[in-house]
């Protein structure tokens, strides 16, 4: 169990570093260097790199090494288009499965988001944006859908952080979250699904307007 936990931690750390932009595309990930940085042997690092290759984030070239693949412009666009459909489904399901406790938690997150939007506290807004989506995925009541959407959400961390830092998008994003929440609270599946889809589509539009080349 401890060995599995260590491998999982090493994988998650390297994965997060790639998604946060610590490495450039084609940077070499040396097992010995990573092991020293993380305080582990080369074995869990090697296993983590193999797992990252399966996710498409790393390219392992035999007898040469492991290199960062990263996320391309097309990857970002594809992720948001897929997320649009799946978050719509999640919001639809949430109208039937959300609990009173989950509604209260989402309401609290929204109130905090609205406050920090007015204060233009973008760092806190990024955290609250992530929290709202986590709560939405949980409210959908599907472990599988939650896992898929959480992975997609992680893949575009850098992009989300950049766009939420613009005042116009932070305001509209918070307003859209509120509308999705109200539709779920009213148990209106068609409205909740449509609003959730539009929210994600508006996000990719703001990303394109901002310029992906400034982020990736």
Segments predicted by a language model, with ranges:
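Short linear motifs at protein or domain termini
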Residues: 1-96, 102, 138, 204, ...
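Short helix-capping and inter-helix turn/linker motifs at the boundaries of alpha-helical repeat units
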Residues: 5, 103-104, 168-171
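A generic alpha-helix signature
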Residues: 5, 9, 127, 172-175
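Mobile beta-alpha loop/short-helix "lid" or hinge segments that flank ligand
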Residues: 54, 58-59, 152-154, 168-170
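Conserved amphipathic alpha-helical segments that form helical-bundle/coiled-coil interaction surfaces
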Residues: 79, 100-161, 175-183, 191, ...
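Short helix-capping/hinge motifs at transmembrane helix termini and TM-loop junctions
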Residues: 95-96, 141, 165-166
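Bacterial carbohydrate/catabolite-sensing allosteric modules
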Residues: 120, 168, 187, 194, ...
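Short amphipathic alpha-helical interaction/hinge segments
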Residues: 157-167, 204-211
């Amino acid at each position: 169990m401890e060995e599995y936990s260590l491998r999982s931690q090493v994988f998650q750390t390297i994965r997060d570093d790639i998604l946060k932009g610590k490495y450039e595309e084609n940077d070499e990930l040396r097992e010995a260097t990573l092991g020293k940085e993380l305080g582990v042997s080369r074995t869990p690092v090697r296993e983590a790199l193999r797992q990252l290759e399966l996710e498409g984030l790393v390219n392992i070239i035999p007898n040469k090494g492991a290199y960062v693949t990263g996320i391309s412009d097309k990857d970002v666009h594809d992720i948001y288009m897929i997320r649009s459909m799946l978050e719509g489904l999640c919001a639809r399901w949430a109208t039937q499965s959300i609990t009173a406790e989950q509604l209260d938690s989402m309401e609290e997150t929204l109130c905090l988001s609205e406050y920090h939007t007015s204060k233009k506290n973008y760092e806190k807004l990024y955290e609250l944006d992530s929290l709202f989506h986590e709560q939405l995925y949980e409210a959908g009541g599907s472990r599988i859908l939650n896992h898929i959407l959480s992975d997609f959400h992680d893949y575009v961390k850098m992009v989300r952080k950049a766009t939420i830092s613009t005042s116009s998008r932070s305001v509209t994003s918070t307003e859209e979250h509120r509308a999705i929440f109200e539709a779920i609270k009213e148990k209106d599946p068609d409205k909740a699904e449509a609003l959730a889809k539009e929210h994600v589509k508006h996000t990719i539009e703001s990303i394109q307007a901002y310029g992906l080349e400034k982020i990736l």
